[in-house]
From Swiss-Prot:
Its EC number is 4.1.1.31. GO terms for cellular component: cytosol. This is Phosphoenolpyruvate carboxylase. GO terms for biological process: carbon fixation; oxaloacetate metabolic process; tricarboxylic acid cycle. The active site is at 145, 531. Forms oxaloacetate, a four-carbon dicarboxylic acid source for the tricarboxylic acid cycle. It comes from the Bacteria.
Length: 858
């Protein structure tokens, strides 16, 4: 077989396709296999411009029974699962080839060697480079996502297929494909939060467990190649989780669920570290008669009866016993590892320490015994409601919420000067908000941060201090044992954020806390800002907010660390994470940065250790260089021009949303209501009943609905406002301003993935008087594509050829799923459709199929 990576990819896709065909024949019969082939051929012909084939395809789909439609969608969806698997293997092969080809003179772009060279070229000594890298904290926060709906059973089969492909055993491969095809894809019931916790943390003790030591070793080896000496680095990557602590809008995240999330993560971590210590007991069989041993190692192992004369085995057996009894701490285990490592290096066994102890040390510094400390997130209104009940019961104020905003802040600040609890001893809270808030704080063991969504004023955060005091976590003048993080989401809140932070840092309670914590963490939301103001304004507002918030921190002498609430779609801040970091404002990147890792993106980034290493490598490359200091400021005239265009962009976006009939069109044209009714996620889709305003919808379903119909509106609509600027100026900004270039390239991805021809099929579901909205969207799409290609002086995906090829090859196979989905929606919305369980199942499968085909859902 040819060693050309693309030839190997094509061969694997062809093989998996043939095996799927065999499974379809075996389990569904020749007649159904012929239907699949007929639909595939018609879809390809339609894609090539054959109108008759398109009409024939529509007629064929209309004539299918619900069972046939479901089976057809399942066949194409399984095809995409297999193609996605082959593409992941292709990425692994390409990564390995590029890594093998790199030299000191020609390092791989965005790699560890390129980073080491860049650090030296910027004048850093090895000691300075080592200190800089050891200061960095890249915090990746795992969140649940409604479109990561694959059952764990499917994930098991896909991972087994990876192994069968590696082994090259065609018979086992065929058997596994048959098992995959015969497995039910759709959940019978809506996933519980416990399901999401188990699924969301899956990659931490598996592929990331393998990847983290390789990241640390890769950085050390790169610095050794460039500087001539190997440094000692800890893991710059850490992990957090929201799954089981994110209470914002999710009534199913109870204090009991929060307690379960902590227990589950800690138990998973404990099992993995026990296995690692067991390996060390087995491997480090050094005899005391042959190797000098430090006193600390000898004494720690004296209580172990086995392994006489083998002090390192006894030492690690003692550590194993302490961890088994839950008497160990992360810090204690790290100190014990370092002691053993020193002992080995002192007698010339540095290689043994490097091979056997360093990987465990990297894992301990990355995961700790908590695996991923849990964040709590709650909406500010709920926290104030809880605080109001506490103040009423404690006799402080009968109606806190009726007070003016400044008076609420003053009252809380005064109250927090004392340590007294307000709830009478033994009395349970009456109100649900207070019961849940206090219950969550009590259940919260391994503390990440407490994120306050929809932060508007300082008292939104001070409410957390009051509640924490009630459960013994706050004492006046001292910092809380966790960060309290304001989350600014809407356009208005992003613009007010610098003023809110300034007032927080003037507040004695919060200032003492921030100084004790060594800085302030601020979260900025990419989803709601886009939903509120449109793509261009949201991106600019986020950029300007980071600049202004950083300046506020500088004025007070405290660093501001940003937590970027990015999604996977362009509309929600998606795209290559490394490039996104490179495009952040100068001076906004400190020694710590946090990013959300959405459930939907986890398989794409972490399904294989090699992919995980490369993803982390690219992020660390850009983060380490950005954290060195300010980059080049954009020119004032560029800022002025973009601000002007962004205002016009928002005007156009909001005019569309506010036009009479738009949300009636949206509900008819997209499967938004069905997404809310089907068992996709634990969190409700709607903030309020029917959609009459954009505020009635959560951001993820808004984006997901537009993705399903292949419009991807939130990722580009309104961008044509840039046409009001001179083309030469736009080209100059694109070449010279990384943020602007990143923004346009993200929009180009969404525009390229959109397909207005497929979207037009959904007009069958829309009443005639509302169909003009589609024509407007199609015209705006064409106009925006033309504008960006003029700015780039090249096709939309001129610098993303792999993605361009992927879209071109996938579209003919996604199209049939969309065509079937239109017919299923028509039937589902007809009288009696919602009672048809087979129809519900088929419709859900079509939503999953489009998500699998596009490799992005919202």
């Amino acid at each position: 077989m040819s060693q050309d990576p693309f030839a190997l990819l094509k061969a694997e896709v062809d093989l998996l396709g043939r095996l799927l065909g065999e499974a379809i024949r075996t389990l569904s019969g020749e007649r159904f296999f012929a239907l699949v082939e007929e639909v595939r051929a018609l879809a390809k012909a339609r894609r090539q411009g054959d109108e008759a084939a398109g009409e024939a395809l529509l007629a064929r789909v209309e004539g299918l029974s619900t069972e046939e439609a479901e089976a057809l969608v399942r066949a194409f969806t399984h095809y995409f699962h297999l193609v996605n698997l082959a593409e992941e293997r292709h990425r692994v092969r390409v990564n390995r080839l590029r890594a093998q080809a790199e030299t000191l003179e020609s390092p791989r772009p965005e790699g560890f060697l390129a980073l080491a060279k860049a650090l030296k070229e910027r004048g850093l000594s090895l000691e300075e480079a080592e200190a800089h890298l050891n200061r960095l904290e890249l915090l990746l926060t795992f969140t649940a996502h409604p479109t990561e709906t694959r059952r764990r059973t499917l994930r098991h089969h896909l991972e087994a297929l990876q192994r069968e492909l590696e082994a090259g055993d065609r018979e086992r491969l065929a058997a596994r494909v048959a098992l995959l095809y015969g497995t039910e894809e759709v959940r019978k019931a809506r996933p519980t939060v416990e399901d999401e916790i188990k699924g969301g943390l899956y990659y931490l003790p598996t592929t990331l467990w393998e990847a983290v030591p390789r990241v640390v070793a890769g950085l050390e080896a790169a610095l050794e190649r460039v500087y001539g000496r190997r440094p000692r680095l800890k893991s710059p990557v850490r992990f957090r989780s929201w799954i089981g602590g994110d209470r914002d809008g999710n009534p199913f995240v109870t204090p009991e669920v929060t307690a379960f999330a902590g227990r589950y993560a800690r138990e998973v971590a404990r099992r993995r570290f026990l296995e690692a210590l067991e390996d060390l007991v087995r491997d480090l069989s050094l005899a005391e008669a042959r190797v000098p041993v430090p006193r600390e190692v000898r004494e720690r192992g004296e209580g172990v009866e086995r392994f006489m004369g083998e002090p390192y085995r006894r030492y690690f057996a003692a550590l194993y016993r302490a961890l088994e009894r839950e008497e160990a701490t992360t810090e204690g285990l790290l100190a014990a590892l370092k002691a053993a490592e020193r002992g080995l290096r002192e007698v010339g066994l540095g290689r043994v320490a490097e091979a056997f102890l360093d990987p465990l040390e990297a894992r301990l510094s990355a995961f700790g015994l908590e695996l991923a400390p849990l964040d709590l997130r709650e909406e500010s209104g709920r926290l104030l409601e809880a605080a109001a009940e506490l103040l009423r019961v404690g006799g402080v104020h009968p109606d806190f919420l009726a007070l003016p905003q400044e008076e609420r802040e003053r009252l809380l600040t005064e109250e927090l000067k004392t340590a007294r609890p307000l709830l009478p001893v033994g009395e349970a809270p009456e109100g649900e908000a207070l019961r849940v808030a206090l219950g969550a704080l009590k259940a919260w063991r391994d503390k990440g941060a407490h994120v306050v969504s929809m932060t508007h004023h300082p008292e939104d955060l001070l409410a957390v201090f009051l509640l924490a005091r009630e459960v013994g976590l706050y004492r006046p003048g001292r910092p809380l044992p966790f960060d309290v993080v304001p989350l600014f989401e809407t356009l208005e809140d992003l613009r007010r954020a610098p003023g809110v932070l300034r007032r927080l840092l003037e507040n004695p309670v919060f200032l003492a806390h921030a100084r004790g914590r060594g800085g302030v963490e601020v979260m900025i939301g990419y989803s709601d800002s886009n939903k509120d103001a449109g793509f261009l304004m949201a991106n600019l507002a986020l950029y300007e907010a980071q600049e202004a918030l950083s300046r506020v921190g500088e004025e007070v002498g405290l660093p501001v660390y940003f937590f970027h609430g990015r999604g996977t779609s362009t509309a929600r801040g998606g795209g290559p994470a490394g490039r996104a970091i490179a495009s952040l404002p100068p001076r906004s990147v400190g020694r710590r940065i946090r990013l959300t890792e959405q459930g939907e993106a986890l398989a794409d980034r972490y399904s294989h250790p090699d992919l995980a290493v490369r993803h982390l490598e690219q992020m660390l490359y850009h983060f380490a260089l950005a954290a060195l200091g300010p980059g080049q400021e954009p020119e004032a005239r560029w800022r002025e021009a973009l601000a002007q265009a962004a205002e016009e962009s928002t005007r156009r976006y909001r005019a569309l949303l506010q036009e009479e009939g738009f949300f009636d069109f949206f509900e008819a044209f997209t499967p938004i209501r069905e997404i809310g009714e089907l068992p996709i996620a634990s969190r409700p889709v709607y903030r309020r009943g029917r959609v009459r305003d954009i505020r009635d919808l959560r951001a993820i379903p808004w984006v997901m609905a537009w993705t399903q119909v292949r419009v991807l509106l939130p990722g580009w609509y309104g961008l044509s406002a840039l046409e009001e600027l001179p083309l030469d100026l736009l080209r100059e900004m694109y070449r010279g301003w990384p943020f602007f270039a990143s923004t346009l390239e993200a929009a180009a991805m969404a525009l390229a993935k959109a397909d207005m021809g497929v979207a037009r099929l959904y007009l069958r579901l829309v009443p005639e008087p509302l169909r003009f909205f589609y024509r407007r969207l199609a015209e705006e799409h064409a106009r925006t594509v033309a504008l960006l290609e003029a700015v780039f002086q090249a096709p939309l995906l001129h610098n993303q050829r792999t993605l361009e090829r992927q879209i071109r090859l996938r579209n003919p196979y996604v199209d049939p799923i969309n065509i079937v989905q239109v017919e299923l929606l028509r039937r589902y919305r007809a009288p009696g459709g919602k009672e048809d369980e087979a129809l519900r199942r088929a419709l859900l499968l079509s939503i999953l199929g489009v998500a699998a085909g596009l490799r992005n859902a919202g």
